[in-house]
Amino acid sequence: FVGFKAGVKDYKLTYYTPDYETKDTDILAAFRVTPQPGVPPEEAGAAVAAESSTGTWTTVWTDGLTSLDRYKGRCYGIEPVAGEENQFIAYVAYPLDLFEEGSVTNMFTSIVGNVFGFKALRALRLEDLRIPPAYSKTFQGPPHGIQVERDKLNKYGRPLLGCTIKPKLGLSAKNYGRAVYECLRGGLDFTKDDENVNSQPFMRWRDRFLFCAEAIYKSQAETGEIKGHYLNATAGTCEEMIKRAVFARELGVPIVMHDYLTGGFTANTSLAHYCRDNGLLLHIHRAMHAVIDRQKNHGMHFRVLAKALRMSGGDHIHAGTVVGKLEGEREITLGFVDLLRDDFIEKDRSRGIYFTQDWVSMPGVLPVASGGIHVWHMPALTEIFGDDSVLQFGGGTLGHPWGNAPGAVANRVALEACVQARNEGRDLAREGNEIIREAAKWSPELAAACEVWKEIKFEFEAMDTL
């Protein structure tokens, strides 16, 4: 007699516990499960809980050396998805001790690791995570957060304006710096390295950093406003990434940038710590997110990637536009925008928020709206995102018929007009076009922009619906 019963047994006997009362310290997950035909939902949900925590495909002798009751993940609820015949939401609770403190990497390796290749499931999607304060408190979080950023930049009561420098690849460092200068002097707060711009043969990073710093200081002197350019520190190794951040700090610029998904959470968290220690703001780009979050039935919803970024650390993150050329349905986008900015977010299924999330005192992240937006979108963007956001117009600045600086002027005038109209109590949703038209009478730059983009729309159904 060996002391345990060998063999394969149903996961649901151990891992499906509908009576379980979740603890305040548990990490809770909501999975959208599509079982293979013939697999009951309880078994599928239990399999997810097992394979993402303590379980394996057969009972093992070493199970007797630990306490499964203390360490196992539990599927504590299953509900069918309305309008889908073979999809279920499985709720799984994970004991806190399964995770290394302060490591988004470890959290994801467990929760969205091997289980996503599991044969008994046709597809699996992580819709939301509840991060308990007991776990979130082990993370530094954003280097500075919204309030500190406003204080550093001395900009209040309005969204911030940015612009990605295009053409994204092929400019020399000197011409790139020139484009940055024109945008900043025209009235933008920030310009941005495209996420593809790292250090390529046509423009090495050190040269770009130098010419961009020159553009920042020249435009600051001219306008009397604090300016920034997101210098992309993303690199092939962590050491090289930190070296770039160090050079940015030596130049005295206010902000650097990182591609957090392609760069990886470990690198991102290291950079976020460096940024707080050295007074740099950190702008986060989400290149690769659509690989993970675009399919409705498999992968991870962006709200999970957004929560993970707030823990790993970043002061800005791209979050869709609701109105431009990229994905995003309004209520769902606003749901994760609140998860990024607010301290306490109530469960609200209509906005895709499966759990109440309490961030306690972790700083917030500014959502960045970027992609296919222009002056006519300004009232809608001001209305949807409010003051705590960064609105980024790449083509919408550089595509201006008179050049970058007038393009920047047009955007700044449009923004100031919208903010003023809102503060006067006007309804931006209804009177938006009128507000822009009025402002254009006083600004030839804005009038020219209004002329160019009057008809542009990207009309497709959003895929990210509930």
From Swiss-Prot:
Compartment(s): Plastid, Chloroplast
Keywords: Calvin cycle, Carbon dioxide fixation, Chloroplast, Disulfide bond, Lyase, Magnesium, Metal-binding, Methylation, Monooxygenase, Oxidoreductase, Photorespiration, Photosynthesis, Plastid
Residues that span the membrane, as ranges: none
Organism: Saururus cernuus
Requisite cofactors: Mg(2+)
GO-annotated molecular function: magnesium ion binding; monooxygenase activity; ribulose-bisphosphate carboxylase activity
GO cellular component: chloroplast
The reaction(s) this protein catalyses: 2 (2R)-3-phosphoglycerate + 2 H(+) = D-ribulose 1,5-bisphosphate + CO2 + H2O; D-ribulose 1,5-bisphosphate + O2 = 2-phosphoglycolate + (2R)-3-phosphoglycerate + 2 H(+)
Post-translational modification: The disulfide bond which can form in the large chain dimeric partners within the hexadecamer appears to be associated with oxidative stress and protein turnover.
Name of the molecule in the record: Ribulose bisphosphate carboxylase large chain
Residues at the site labelled Transition state stabilizer: 325
Subunit field text: Heterohexadecamer of 8 large chains and 8 small chains; disulfide-linked. The disulfide link is formed within the large subunit homodimers.
Pfam families for the chain: RuBisCO_large, RuBisCO_large_N
PANTHER family in alphabetical order: RIBULOSE BISPHOSPHATE CARBOXYLASE (PTHR42704), RIBULOSE BISPHOSPHATE CARBOXYLASE LARGE CHAIN (PTHR42704:SF16)
Annotated residues for binding of substrate: 114, 164, 168, 286, 318, 370
Lineage: Eukaryota, Viridiplantae, Streptophyta, Embryophyta, Tracheophyta
Record SUPFAM superfamilies: RuBisCo, C-terminal domain, RuBisCO, large subunit, small (N-terminal) domain
Sequence positions bearing N6,N6,N6-trimethyllysine: 5
Keyword Plastid set for record: yes
Entry's cofactor comment: Binds 1 Mg(2+) ion per subunit.
Active-site feature positions: 166 (proton acceptor), 285 (proton acceptor)
One GO BP: photorespiration
